[in-house]
From Swiss-Prot:
Keywords, in A-Z order: Cytoplasm, DNA damage, DNA repair, DNA replication, DNA-binding, DNA-directed DNA polymerase, Magnesium, Metal-binding, Mutator protein, Nucleotidyltransferase, Transferase
Binding residue positions for Mg(2+): 16, 112
Localization (cell): Cytoplasm
Enzyme category, top tier: transferase
Provenance organism: Bacillus anthracis
Catalytic activity: DNA(n) + a 2'-deoxyribonucleoside 5'-triphosphate = DNA(n+1) + diphosphate
Subunit structure: Monomer.
Keyword hit for Cell inner membrane: no
GO molecular-function terms, A-Z: damaged DNA binding; DNA-directed DNA polymerase activity; magnesium ion binding
Catalytic center residues: 113
Name of this protein: DNA polymerase IV
Note on cofactor: Binds 2 magnesium ions per subunit.
Length: 412
């Protein structure tokens, strides 16, 4: 199959999952197959917007970022699911695991897309055959559809994957650029947003062809060096390489909660922080992962966002340790103002088998005693789907909260 690969240059695939969140929901619940489905915010709140929707929903004119009330007007029978980011992250993890069977040269771009450099993968088949194998594996094993672009560089591969959806495979060569890409408006080009398109329009650049053939000095003067990079890509030139080191950056496990109303009660916020820590812990343990860095995110009522992280000497994975790190960050950085969103994320992830928790003399005996107990508590709670068993510290905090509420209701 070596003859199917270029003697010089590279072969890049861009794998882009189709309607990812909606597709994951359908894979999780087959009764949604073939029906208009949207993943969106709370139906009861008019502020809810469409995060993504199925192709059946798009036939009614429903689009991403559309207000939910408008989507329901266009399609009264629209099925709405609240976003389940735990489910989506798990599906993303499985997706990249499948991609890693074909090559180690993988660069995640987001939760649902990534680049693969298959230049040296000729033993597996032609580029088109490899793309078909990837597409079939994702569809068979995860019930998730994707589109794949095949090209000599990252920009063209990304452009190609957008051309046929769903379940498309598109080959885009440099010689195809004048016919397939140049006639398009500059706003349709990957990497050009609305504001950049407006600036290019100001200097009479309307199409990608005009960008490719435009005066470099005028373009640079208008939008800087980024404009020159865009011009090179419009000509089909892109020297960026697939960066496998970003695969590690993709490995983060996090959960966040947006509150229906602003919260400023510290005990309630700490209780939520512990629930988020527990969720992160369970997902780490499910994947046999550990973390060396814990991060919290606080979004205030006025949309101010604070993100802080703590580097850890030892790898952690248990709820107790994650919550301890998160709560310390919280106490250091919460300014007392009311909060709309709270998040906990474990980063700098490694496989647990590759990492050893370095226990000091005082923590070793305590951890050794508690690990079997924590495992039993988690198993029983998971089996019955509810927190039947809890640690004493959790119960004590709940009792304090209940007692406080009774006092408030009696004397206020």
């Amino acid at each position: 199959m070596r003859e199917m690969y270029p003697k010089k240059g590279r072969v890049i695939l861009h794998v882009d999952m189709n309607c990812f969140f909606a597709s994951v929901e359908i894979a999780h619940d087959s009764s949604l197959q073939g029906k208009p489905l949207a993943v969106a915010g709370n139906e009861k709140e008019r502020k809810g917007i469409i995060i993504t929707c199925s192709y059946e929903a798009r036939e009614y004119g429903i689009r991403t970022t559309m207000p939910l009330w408008e989507a329901k007007r266009l399609c009264p029978q629209l099925i709405v699911r609240r976003p389940n980011f735990t489910l989506y992250r798990e599906a993303s993890f499985q997706m990249f695991q499948i991609l890693s069977r074909f090559t180690e040269k993988i660069q995640p771009v987001s939760i649902d897309e990534g680049y693969l450099d298959i230049t040296d993968c000729y033993a597996l088949g032609s580029p088109l055959e490899i793309a078909k194998m990837i597409q079939q594996a994702l569809l068979t094993e995860l019930q998730l559809p994707c589109s794949i672009g095949i090209a000599p560089n990252l920009f063209l591969a990304k452009t190609a994957s957008d051309m046929k959806k769903p379940l498309g495979i598109t080959v885009l060569r440099k010689r195809d650029i004048p016919e397939m890409i140049w006639p398009l408006p500059v706003g349709a080009m990957h990497g050009i947003g609305e504001k950049t398109a407006e600036k290019l329009n100001d200097i009479h650049i309307q199409t990608i062809e005009q960008l490719a053939k435009g005066n470099e000095h005028i373009i640079r003067a208008k939008i800087g060096k980024h404009g020159v990079d865009l011009q090179r890509r419009a000509k089909g030139m892109d020297d960026r390489e697939v960066d496998p080191s970003q695969m590690g950056q993709h490995k983060s496990v996090g959960n966040s909660m947006t509150f229906s109303k602003d919260m400023d009660e510290e005990k309630e916020l700490l209780d939520m922080l512990q629930r988020l820590s527990k969720s992160v812990s369970k997902r780490l343990q499910k994947r046999t992962l550990v973390s060396y860095n814990i991060q919290i995110m606080i979004k205030y009522h006025d949309r101010r966002t604070v993100t802080r992280s703590k580097q850890l000497k030892n790898a952690i994975w248990e709820e107790r340790d994650i919550f301890q790190a998160a709560s310390r960050l919280w106490k250091q950085h919460w300014d007392g103002d009311s909060v709309r969103l709270l998040g906990v994320t474990a980063t700098e992830i490694e496989w647990k088998t590759e990492s050893v928790k370095q226990l000091d003399l005082f923590s070793f005996e305590e951890d050794a005693k508690e690990e079997p107990l924590l495992a039993v508590i988690d198993q029983i709670n998971d089996k019955y789907g509810m927190p039947l068993l809890q640690r004493g510290s959790q119960l004590l905090r709940k009792q304090e909260k209940s007692f406080q509420q009774k006092l408030e209701s009696k004397f206020m």
